[in-house]
């Protein structure tokens, strides 16, 4: 399994950012291999993160190459390039 963390900064009001995230939710639910996605926010103004859990490297790579992934900066009107971190999950506590 793969854990992907996409940290982003946006000047959108939180309500608008959440509205856009909810509108895009069905597209993310339809992604093969995406086991879970967490929508999170930082204590810093305008700082958010999407935390993704992928079933395989192939699913993760397929998403990275997708139009949906490439649309993230525009959809949330990012003010700088997102910070993306990818980690291999060694094991999980609960299943």
Report residues per predicted region.
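Short S/T/G/P-rich N-terminal loop/turn motif that feeds into the first structured element of a domain
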Residues: 1-48, 55-65, 78-95
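A common structural junction motif
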Residues: 70-74
């Amino acid at each position: 399994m793969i854990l992907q963390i996409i940290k982003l900064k946006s000047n959108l009001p939180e309500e608008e950012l959440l509205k856009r995230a909810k509108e895009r939710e069905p597209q993310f639910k339809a992604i093969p291999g995406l086991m879970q996605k967490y929508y999170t926010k930082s204590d810093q103004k305008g700082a958010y993160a999407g935390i993704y859990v992928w079933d395989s490297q192939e699913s993760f790579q397929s998403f990275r190459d997708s139009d949906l992934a490439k649309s993230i900066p525009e959809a949330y009107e990012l003010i700088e390039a997102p910070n993306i971190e990818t980690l291999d999950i060694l094991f999980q506590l609960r299943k």
